[in-house]
């Protein structure tokens, strides 16, 4: 007999909890199915010395033939009438138990989210097994590509037409590690928290302090969640009254094209930075190298971010903020996870994106994002790669 079990995937973009969410624009994806065929086999005698029972053993007269599942699919219990066959390890020992992957404190990065269109665009969640996500939004484009891991852990967010003003917006890219929870939480909450804190602030120091409160509030809220795991690097760009406010915690980076010259607006937070290493050691932590990479407590390769409860004493959520007045020669802004920057330099990224952003009648922002992502992948990046491009002259 044969049995087909339809496994419904969650939508690529699910509703956001943000105040600006527009549920009408949620996208959905087609179903995928897992097909299993069970055929009866005549019991065969086996050697008494064999301690285990295989799929074709006398104790198991049914042979399971599994067709290759969809990419990223994790098998769960499959029901056959009143009985069930589990892909883990049923009591009869039909299938061999596998030791679960250990994810206590993540090493390395992985690191994605997409916005819902309306007068305000807000982050939503893609399927974890989604291979690629792209979006051409109102005044920005973004492209994200999954690395070699089973789940996409990068997220992004964008709110345009903020407070009904087309010259106000906030964008973000989030690179998760140790799971998607922290990046997803940040993408749904950080921009909202920043906007709430910044309202009414005029002085640059007040704005920078307000952004810091937004980051810290997001981190504190995430750590109160149940089953908190992993963390996320963050980079955000707030456009307010002609000012560009760029903040980061971790190694997501913001780079601006100024007349074709790359200008970094953020500095990566890694244990290899002298000031970061000194801060960590002063508070009782230690930094060492593992396979040539500087890590905190021999584990994490970034020194700031949202989450990372086990290392919270040293992995702080406080961002560094840089505020610039948008000028005419400020052409576009690149926000990207380290999946890009580990393989592509700041100037090279600007040189590749600029002809597509400025050299055509209609800017080909999405094509530029894809070109940068593909270049990093072609150079051997195994990480998730997320690139967002934002033309800046629209805000002058």
UniProtKB/Swiss-Prot annotation:
UniProt cofactor note: Binds 2 magnesium or manganese ions per subunit.
Q: Where is the PPM-type phosphatase domain?
A: 139-392
Q: What is its main location?
A: cytoplasm
Quote the record's binding site residues for Mn(2+) 2: 175, 338, 383
This molecule's function is given as: Protein phosphatase that negatively regulates defense respones. Inactivates MPK4 and MPK6 MAP kinases involved in stress and defense signaling.
The subunit structure is: Interacts with MPK4 and MPK6.
- Indicate the family of this protein: Belongs to the PP2C family.
Know the name of this protein?
Answer: Probable protein phosphatase 2C 25
What's the source species for this entry? Arabidopsis thaliana
């Amino acid at each position: 007999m044969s049995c087909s079990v339809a496994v419904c995937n969650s939508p690529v973009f699910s509703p956001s909890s943000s105040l600006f969410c527009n549920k009408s624009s949620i996208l959905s994806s087609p179903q995928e199915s897992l097909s299993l065929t069970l055929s009866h086999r005549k019991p065969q005698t086996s050697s008494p010395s064999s301690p285990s029972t295989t799929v074709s053993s006398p104790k198991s007269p049914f042979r399971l033939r599994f067709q290759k599942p969809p990419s990223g699919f994790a098998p769960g219990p499959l029901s056959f009438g009143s009985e069930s066959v589990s892909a883990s390890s049923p009591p009869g020992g039909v299938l061999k138990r596998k030791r679960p992957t250990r994810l206590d404190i993540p090493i390395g990065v992985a690191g994605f989210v997409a916005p819902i269109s309306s007068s305000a665009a807000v982050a939503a969640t893609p399927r974890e097994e989604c291979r690629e996500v792209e979006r051409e939004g109102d005044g920005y484009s973004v492209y994200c590509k999954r690395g070699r891991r089973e789940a996409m852990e990068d997220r992004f967010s964008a709110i345009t037409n903020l407070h009904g003003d087309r010259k106000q917006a906030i964008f973000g890219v989030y690179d998760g590690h140790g799971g998607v929870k922290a990046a997803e939480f940040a993408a749904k909450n950080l921009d909202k928290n920043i906007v709430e804190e910044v309202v009414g602030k005029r002085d640059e120091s007040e704005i920078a302090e307000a952004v810091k409160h937004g980051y810290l509030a997001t981190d504190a809220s995430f750590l109160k969640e149940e089953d908190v795991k992993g963390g996320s690097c963050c980079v955000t760009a707030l456009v307010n009254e002609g000012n560009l406010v760029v903040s980061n915690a971790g190694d997501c980076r913001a780079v601006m094209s100024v007349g074709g010259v790359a200008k970094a607006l953020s500095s990566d937070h890694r244990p290899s930075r002298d000031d970061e290493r000194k801060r960590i050691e002063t508070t009782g932590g230690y930094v060492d190298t593992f396979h040539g990479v500087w890590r905190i407590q021999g584990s994490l390769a970034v020194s700031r971010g949202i989450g990372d409860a086990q290392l919270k004493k040293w992995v702080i959520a406080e961002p560094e903020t840089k505020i610039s007045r948008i000028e005419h020669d400020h052409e576009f802004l690149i926000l990207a996870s380290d999946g890009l920057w580990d393989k592509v330099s700041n100037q090279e990224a600007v040189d590749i994106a600029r002809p597509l952003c400025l050299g055509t009648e209609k800017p080909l922002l999405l094509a530029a994002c894809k070109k940068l992502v593909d270049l990093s992948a072609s150079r051997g990046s195994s990480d998730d790669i997320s690139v967002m491009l934002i033309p800046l002259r629209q805000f002058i």
